[in-house]
């Protein structure tokens, strides 16, 4: 089981309640998890960055939101999920 930060979980809830198609993904090499949204000709990849700890498990350390053709924004853990979701929707609706 992978532990994720509250902000990531809240963004996933917004996505699930939206009209957007999405795909969940995991990277078994480094423990990262994410969700990919593809809407028309635009895409957003939201990655929950993980850091390994001594017992071999991972802890969440931040979010990376990649906007296709519009750059990447990286956030430390503990941000505002509602604001992040509004940024994502604004990008997808432009």
Where are the regions that the model predicts?
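Negatively charged, low-complexity tracts enriched in Asp/Glu with abundant Ser/Thr
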Residues: 1-39, 68-74
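Intrinsically disordered, low-complexity regulatory segments enriched in Ser/Thr/Pro
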Residues: 42-83
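Residue-level detector of alpha-helical secondary structure
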Residues: 9, 13-16, 82, 86-89, ...
């Amino acid at each position: 089981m992978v532990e994720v930060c509250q902000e990531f979980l809240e963004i996933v809830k917004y996505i699930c309640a939206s009209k957007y198609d999405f795909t969940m993904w995991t990277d078994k090499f480094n423990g990262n998890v994410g969700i990919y949204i593809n809407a028309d000709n635009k895409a957003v990849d939201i990655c929950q960055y993980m850091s390994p700890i001594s017992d071999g498990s991972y802890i969440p350390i931040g979010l990376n939101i990649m906007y296709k053709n519009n750059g990447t924004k990286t956030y430390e853990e503990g941000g505002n999920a509602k604001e992040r979701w509004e940024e994502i929707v604004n990008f997808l609706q432009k």
